[in-house]
Design a protein with these regions (language model features):
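N-terminal secretion-targeting helices of virulence/extracellular proteins
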Residues: 1-103
């Protein structure tokens, strides 16, 4: 049987992991938007021709994938929080039943 302290520690750990995933997703979004997008704009301004167009299209697809991955990571973090809350509530309810039970 889990103790109240271990339930709370596990809940906080899960929330901390979700926060880390959100931070990674935020960093990926920033990288994709400002840094990578700026690089593609510089390339577009300074490199002309068929190969340049193909390379920029490839870069745009990569940028879209990076944004999609960031969105997916945010979704995973939200799911972790939801599951952690449900598990926390269930474990606390089970603990309350165990404490109230008289043998």
């Amino acid at each position: 049987m889990a103790t109240r302290e271990s339930i709370e520690i596990n809940f906080k750990a899960a929330l901390g992991q979700a926060d880390k995933i959100d931070n990674i997703a935020d960093n990926l979004s920033k990288l994709s938007g400002a840094k990578f997008g700026g690089t593609l704009q510089n390339l577009s301004a300074n490199w002309k021709g068929e190969n340049a167009s193909l390379y920029l299209e490839k870069g745009s697809r990569l940028q879209e994938k990076m944004n999609g991955t960031a969105e997916g990571l945010h979704s995973v973090a939200a799911d972790i929080r939801t599951i952690a809350r449900r598990l926390y509530e269930a474990e606390m309810a089970a603990l309350a039943v165990a404490v109230d039970r008289a043998y």
